[in-house]
Amino acid sequence: MRFSLLVRMAWEKEMNNKQHTTTAGEDYLESVLILQKKLGMVRSVDVARHMEVSKPSVCYAVGTLREGGFLTTDENHYIHLTDLGRDVAEKIYERHCFFTKHFISIGVDPETAEADACRIEHDISAETYERLKESVTKE
């Protein structure tokens, strides 16, 4: 079985929900969360600028995530995270911040630390992440 499939299965189990996202979907949810904290209200164009992707890509992702129950859009086309979407976004963002902070603390260039954190945040299992977090806290 491929590693990424195992990670996704663990993620599903962790959320106690049959719905799951892809790495790209998690990136979109994380971006919406970050932008909501920064701007309050989020539009597709904001997500496109933040992620440096095309507006059609955002529209496709928003549609897919809406169908999955991760977000909604209102009559003014603002994007809102559902409880499920917020849960996923917050978990991914927490991991991102954790890895970025610790990579920088060991001397990794901030840009490289951000890029590496963005990759690792999706693939690490919940169990491994929690054990790593515990071990760092104990030190």
Q: Which sequence ranges carry the predicted segments?
A:
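Arg/Lys-rich, alpha-helical DNA-contact motif
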Residues: Y93-A126
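N-terminal helix-turn-helix DNA-binding core of bacterial DNA-binding proteins
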Residues: N16-V53
